[in-house]
Amino acid sequence: MKRLLLTIVCLLAVMVGASAQRLVIIHVNDTHSHLDPERTGEDVGHGGIIERAAYIDSVRNAVGKDKVLLLHAGDWNQGSPYYSIFGGDLEVSLINALKYDCLTLGNHEFDNGVEDLGRRVKGIKAPVVCANYDFSQFDMGRRGVKPCTIIRRGGLKIGIIGMLTDITKVVSYETASRIPRAGTDAEVVNKWADYLRNDKKCDLVIVLSHLGYDEDLDLVKETRGVDLVVGGHSHTFVKDLEYRTDLEGKQVPVIQDGCWGLNIGRIDVY
């Protein structure tokens, strides 16, 4: 498996001077129901759920489960016969088995409609976050999907905001027309970043995004209070962290892992 191993040193001001590793962020995106190793192409024999699980377990065993944050940036559904046959239920079982800490929605999560997605979301044990669409009229909004969440790992209080691509372009009209936006992308990120940073006193604020790589880069320039953007949707493999300057002049890193689970992102925070 190609593993994307990246290190962010002194990501937060409170960490400057710390010598011990505080946190490992493991992240994937756009796995698209690829549960088996690839059968063709240059990645033949690589990938698959077993290989991903083995790597995740190895990191947890090495640094301690309480120091690992496992994220998925959306589109865990659609892309192999497993989804066609089981309708996304198998992916939910595996998300729970791997013990993800947080996920955001991708557009392909809506392929069987918003009600069916709501049924599956309720089966996911980890928080599912999406801030730029309003699901309050649906059962999944009342009992499942929230704009953001707070997770404690490695002695840190971590706020995570979810973002979803423009569904009017990539989801059926029947579904997309029923789901109102909660504001512009920049508006909702600024709102929830302020809430997490100032009201909830989070040490680290992450945007878990399914907007696309270029959109993530642009988003940073219109927002404040965000420390890291973990992205998906465009299937972009980012070898090195790309930085953009936010409204306060801070350099914010943006990352994405390609697709199909062939790359696993790792960010070490000290």
Question: What spans do the regions from the language model cover?
Answer:
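Short linear, low-complexity motifs centered on an aromatic residue
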Residues: 1-2, 19
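Sec-dependent signal peptide recognition
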Residues: 2-9
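Hydrophobic h-region of N-terminal signal peptides that target proteins for export
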Residues: 9-18
